[in-house]
Protein backbone atom coordinates (compact mmCIF):
# COMPACT_ATOMS: atom_id res chain seq x y z
CA UNK A 1 0.00 0.00 0.00
CA UNK A 2 1.31 3.44 -0.99
CA UNK A 3 0.07 6.72 0.41
CA UNK A 4 0.84 10.31 -0.62
CA UNK A 5 1.40 13.04 1.95
CA UNK A 6 1.35 16.40 0.19
CA UNK A 7 2.49 19.54 2.01
CA UNK A 8 0.17 22.36 1.05
CA UNK A 9 -0.04 24.62 4.10
CA UNK A 10 2.47 27.27 3.05
CA UNK A 11 1.25 30.87 2.86
CA UNK A 12 3.40 31.69 -0.15
CA UNK A 13 4.07 35.27 0.91
CA UNK A 14 6.44 35.78 -2.05
CA UNK A 15 3.51 35.17 -4.41
CA UNK A 16 2.12 38.58 -3.33
CA UNK A 17 -1.41 37.21 -3.41
CA UNK A 18 -4.29 36.46 -1.04
CA UNK A 19 -4.86 33.16 -2.83
CA UNK A 20 -3.37 30.07 -1.17
CA UNK A 21 -0.03 29.31 -2.81
CA UNK A 22 -1.02 25.84 -4.02
CA UNK A 23 -4.11 27.22 -5.78
CA UNK A 24 -2.16 29.31 -8.28
CA UNK A 25 -2.45 27.90 -11.78
CA UNK A 26 -0.03 26.22 -14.14
CA UNK A 27 -1.93 25.79 -17.37
CA UNK A 28 -5.55 25.09 -16.47
CA UNK A 29 -4.87 23.33 -13.17
CA UNK A 30 -3.76 24.45 -9.72
CA UNK A 31 -0.26 23.62 -8.50
CA UNK A 32 -1.80 21.21 -6.00
CA UNK A 33 -3.94 19.44 -8.59
CA UNK A 34 -0.88 18.76 -10.73
CA UNK A 35 0.81 17.03 -7.78
CA UNK A 36 -2.32 15.06 -6.88
CA UNK A 37 -2.68 13.88 -10.47
CA UNK A 38 0.97 12.80 -10.66
CA UNK A 39 0.75 10.77 -7.46
CA UNK A 40 -2.65 9.11 -7.90
CA UNK A 41 -1.60 6.38 -10.37
CA UNK A 42 0.81 4.89 -7.82
CA UNK A 43 -0.86 5.52 -4.44
CA UNK A 44 -3.91 4.12 -2.68
CA UNK A 45 -4.67 7.25 -0.65
CA UNK A 46 -3.87 10.97 -0.73
CA UNK A 47 -3.38 13.15 2.35
CA UNK A 48 -3.03 16.91 1.90
CA UNK A 49 -1.73 19.07 4.75
CA UNK A 50 -3.42 22.47 4.71
CA UNK A 51 -3.24 25.63 6.78
CA UNK A 52 -3.51 28.98 4.98
CA UNK A 53 -6.93 29.40 3.30
CA UNK A 54 -7.71 25.74 3.95
CA UNK A 55 -11.38 26.05 2.98
CA UNK A 56 -10.56 27.47 -0.44
CA UNK A 57 -8.04 24.68 -1.01
CA UNK A 58 -10.63 22.05 -0.10
CA UNK A 59 -13.25 23.67 -2.35
CA UNK A 60 -10.86 23.49 -5.30
CA UNK A 61 -10.78 19.70 -5.10
CA UNK A 62 -14.42 18.85 -4.32
CA UNK A 63 -15.39 15.38 -5.47
CA UNK A 64 -11.93 13.87 -5.08
CA UNK A 65 -11.00 11.29 -2.45
CA UNK A 66 -8.61 13.30 -0.31
CA UNK A 67 -7.94 13.20 3.41
CA UNK A 68 -7.40 16.73 4.69
CA UNK A 69 -4.92 17.29 7.51
CA UNK A 70 -4.88 20.66 9.31
CA UNK A 71 -1.62 22.34 10.34
CA UNK A 72 -2.70 25.15 12.66
CA UNK A 73 0.80 26.56 13.21
CA UNK A 74 3.61 26.55 10.68
CA UNK A 75 6.57 25.22 12.62
CA UNK A 76 8.51 23.57 9.81
CA UNK A 77 8.20 20.72 7.35
CA UNK A 78 8.70 18.11 10.06
CA UNK A 79 5.88 19.61 12.09
CA UNK A 80 3.65 19.60 9.01
CA UNK A 81 4.11 15.88 8.39
CA UNK A 82 3.72 15.15 12.12
CA UNK A 83 0.09 16.25 11.77
CA UNK A 84 -0.49 13.29 9.44
CA UNK A 85 0.76 10.64 11.90
CA UNK A 86 -2.79 9.48 12.82
CA UNK A 87 -3.40 8.67 9.15
CA UNK A 88 -0.14 6.84 8.41
CA UNK A 89 -0.37 3.06 8.07
CA UNK A 90 2.80 1.53 9.51
CA UNK A 91 2.97 -0.97 6.66
CA UNK A 92 2.52 1.58 3.88
CA UNK A 93 5.14 3.32 1.78
CA UNK A 94 4.67 7.07 2.20
CA UNK A 95 5.50 9.47 -0.61
CA UNK A 96 6.26 12.92 0.80
CA UNK A 97 5.40 15.52 -1.83
CA UNK A 98 5.04 19.29 -2.08
CA UNK A 99 1.99 21.11 -3.37
CA UNK A 100 4.10 23.80 -5.04
CA UNK A 101 6.18 21.39 -7.17
CA UNK A 102 3.70 20.85 -10.03
CA UNK A 103 5.94 19.34 -12.71
CA UNK A 104 6.89 16.17 -10.85
CA UNK A 105 6.20 13.13 -13.05
CA UNK A 106 4.48 9.88 -12.13
CA UNK A 107 7.39 7.92 -13.63
CA UNK A 108 9.85 9.70 -11.36
CA UNK A 109 7.76 8.92 -8.29
CA UNK A 110 7.49 5.29 -9.38
CA UNK A 111 11.28 5.00 -9.65
CA UNK A 112 11.72 6.68 -6.28
CA UNK A 113 9.27 4.26 -4.68
CA UNK A 114 11.07 1.29 -6.24
CA UNK A 115 14.40 2.46 -4.82
CA UNK A 116 12.87 2.46 -1.34
CA UNK A 117 11.94 -1.22 -1.41
CA UNK A 118 15.14 -2.76 0.07
CA UNK A 119 15.64 -0.45 3.07
CA UNK A 120 12.31 1.37 3.30
CA UNK A 121 13.76 4.82 2.60
CA UNK A 122 14.75 6.71 -0.55
CA UNK A 123 15.34 10.36 -1.42
CA UNK A 124 14.88 12.28 -4.65
CA UNK A 125 17.83 14.53 -5.39
CA UNK A 126 19.00 16.59 -8.36
CA UNK A 127 22.27 18.19 -9.49
CA UNK A 128 22.11 21.99 -9.68
CA UNK A 129 24.54 24.36 -11.40
CA UNK A 130 23.64 26.95 -8.78
CA UNK A 131 22.49 25.18 -5.60
CA UNK A 132 22.10 28.37 -3.55
CA UNK A 133 19.18 28.20 -1.14
CA UNK A 134 18.79 24.42 -1.22
CA UNK A 135 19.64 21.71 1.30
CA UNK A 136 22.77 19.77 0.33
CA UNK A 137 23.03 15.96 0.23
CA UNK A 138 25.98 14.93 2.39
CA UNK A 139 27.62 11.62 1.43
CA UNK A 140 30.56 9.63 2.81
CA UNK A 141 33.57 8.23 0.93
CA UNK A 142 31.48 5.22 -0.13
CA UNK A 143 28.79 7.52 -1.60
CA UNK A 144 26.30 6.59 1.11
CA UNK A 145 23.94 9.35 2.25
CA UNK A 146 24.80 10.69 5.71
CA UNK A 147 22.54 13.71 6.12
CA UNK A 148 20.96 16.77 4.54
CA UNK A 149 22.25 20.20 5.55
CA UNK A 150 20.12 23.28 4.89
CA UNK A 151 21.72 26.31 3.22
CA UNK A 152 21.61 28.45 6.36
CA UNK A 153 23.22 25.73 8.47
CA UNK A 154 25.87 24.58 5.95
CA UNK A 155 29.64 25.01 6.30
CA UNK A 156 31.75 26.55 3.52
CA UNK A 157 32.73 23.10 2.22
CA UNK A 158 29.15 21.86 2.31
CA UNK A 159 28.00 24.89 0.33
CA UNK A 160 30.17 23.68 -2.58
CA UNK A 161 28.08 20.51 -2.98
CA UNK A 162 25.88 20.57 -6.10
CA UNK A 163 23.61 17.63 -5.27
CA UNK A 164 20.57 19.05 -3.53
CA UNK A 165 17.60 17.66 -1.69
CA UNK A 166 14.28 18.10 -3.50
CA UNK A 167 12.36 17.34 -0.30
CA UNK A 168 10.54 14.50 -2.04
CA UNK A 169 11.04 11.11 -0.42
CA UNK A 170 9.60 7.62 -0.10
CA UNK A 171 9.67 6.04 3.36
CA UNK A 172 8.01 3.16 5.15
CA UNK A 173 5.30 4.20 7.58
CA UNK A 174 7.03 2.54 10.55
CA UNK A 175 10.23 4.52 9.96
CA UNK A 176 8.43 7.78 9.26
CA UNK A 177 6.37 7.66 12.45
CA UNK A 178 9.41 6.72 14.54
CA UNK A 179 11.60 9.54 13.28
CA UNK A 180 8.87 12.19 13.22
CA UNK A 181 8.35 11.62 16.95
CA UNK A 182 12.08 12.13 17.57
CA UNK A 183 12.38 15.50 15.80
CA UNK A 184 13.69 18.49 17.74
CA UNK A 185 14.13 22.14 16.66
CA UNK A 186 17.94 22.05 16.68
CA UNK A 187 18.55 24.69 14.01
CA UNK A 188 18.82 28.44 13.54
CA UNK A 189 15.13 28.74 12.62
CA UNK A 190 13.81 26.90 15.67
CA UNK A 191 11.72 24.70 13.37
CA UNK A 192 11.22 20.97 12.97
CA UNK A 193 13.00 19.97 9.77
CA UNK A 194 11.70 16.89 7.98
CA UNK A 195 15.22 16.46 6.60
CA UNK A 196 16.51 15.64 10.09
CA UNK A 197 14.94 12.20 9.81
CA UNK A 198 17.71 11.32 7.34
CA UNK A 199 20.45 11.60 9.96
CA UNK A 200 18.32 9.66 12.44
CA UNK A 201 17.87 6.85 9.93
CA UNK A 202 21.61 6.76 9.24
CA UNK A 203 22.29 6.38 12.97
CA UNK A 204 19.93 3.38 12.91
CA UNK A 205 22.01 1.91 10.04
CA UNK A 206 19.21 2.36 7.52
CA UNK A 207 20.77 2.32 4.05
CA UNK A 208 19.06 5.31 2.44
CA UNK A 209 18.69 4.93 -1.31
CA UNK A 210 18.41 7.79 -3.76
CA UNK A 211 17.18 8.56 -7.23
CA UNK A 212 18.75 11.52 -9.01
CA UNK A 213 16.18 13.34 -11.10
CA UNK A 214 17.50 14.20 -14.56
CA UNK A 215 15.74 17.54 -14.87
CA UNK A 216 15.99 20.34 -12.28
CA UNK A 217 12.85 21.84 -13.85
CA UNK A 218 10.78 18.81 -12.86
CA UNK A 219 11.44 19.38 -9.16
CA UNK A 220 11.38 23.18 -9.20
CA UNK A 221 9.18 24.80 -6.58
CA UNK A 222 7.01 27.74 -7.64
CA UNK A 223 7.71 30.78 -5.47
CA UNK A 224 6.69 33.67 -7.71
CA UNK A 225 3.79 34.23 -10.11
CA UNK A 226 6.24 34.69 -13.00
CA UNK A 227 7.60 31.20 -12.52
Residue ranges and their predicted role:
Residues 216-227:
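Extended, small-residue-rich solenoid/repeat segments and analogous flexible loops
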Residues 1-17:
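N-terminal nucleotide-binding beta1-loop-alpha1 segment
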Residues 199-212:
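Catalytic donor-sugar/metal-binding loop of nucleotide-sugar-dependent glycosyltransferases
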Amino acid sequence: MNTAIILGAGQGTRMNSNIAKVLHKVGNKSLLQHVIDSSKPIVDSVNVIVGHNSNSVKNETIGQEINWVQQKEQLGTGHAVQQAIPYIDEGSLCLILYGDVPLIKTQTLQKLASRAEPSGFSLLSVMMENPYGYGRIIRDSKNSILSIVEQKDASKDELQIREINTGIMAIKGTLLIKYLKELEPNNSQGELYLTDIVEKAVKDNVNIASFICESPTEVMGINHKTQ
